[in-house]
């Protein structure tokens, strides 16, 4: 008897399931591999560029913080000697001016609300 089966009007012969190993186009496979390698190198290059930019920006931030720290150290040494650096004076007077402006604007607002409450 024949081992073939009839399914849906078609005769199927017994054998392995799935794809049959066809002739693989070696040139196409090689080209796909080369393309994949090119893309991988491009991704790697971009990743390294990003990391280098990140490192340089962090190094710039570190330098700026070191300069700021040195400035604060100098201010502290000057204050230990009884001198008040002009920068600190400017900061303090700037804060006092902004506080006085805030207080005056609060008084103005409070005066307006008092005037409104007395009007009835």
From Swiss-Prot:
Organism superkingdom: Eukaryota
Gene Ontology molecular-function annotations: DNA binding; DNA-binding transcription factor activity
Gene Ontology terms: cellular component: nuclear body; nucleus
Region (Disordered): 1-24, 93-120
Region of interest (Leucine-zipper), residue spans: 62-69
Annotated region described as Basic motif, given as residue ranges: 29-60
Cited Pfam families: bZIP_2
Post-translational modification: Phosphorylated by AMPK.
Transcription regulation is among the record's keywords: yes
Localization, UniProt: Nucleus
Residue ranges constituting the bZIP domain according to the UniProt record: 23-86
Biased composition (Basic residues): 10-21
UniProt keyword list: Activator, Differentiation, DNA-binding, Host-virus interaction, Nucleus, Phosphoprotein, Transcription, Transcription regulation
Subunit structure of this chain's protein: Interacts with CREB1; regulates CREB1 phosphorylation, stability and transcriptional activity. Interacts with immediate-early (IE) protein BICP22 of bovine herpesvirus-1 (BHV-1).
Family: Belongs to the bZIP family. ATF subfamily.
Function field: Probable regulator of CREB1 transcriptional activity which is involved in adipose cells differentiation. May also play a regulatory role in the cell cycle.
Identification of the protein by name: cAMP-responsive element-binding protein-like 2
Name of the gene: CREBL2
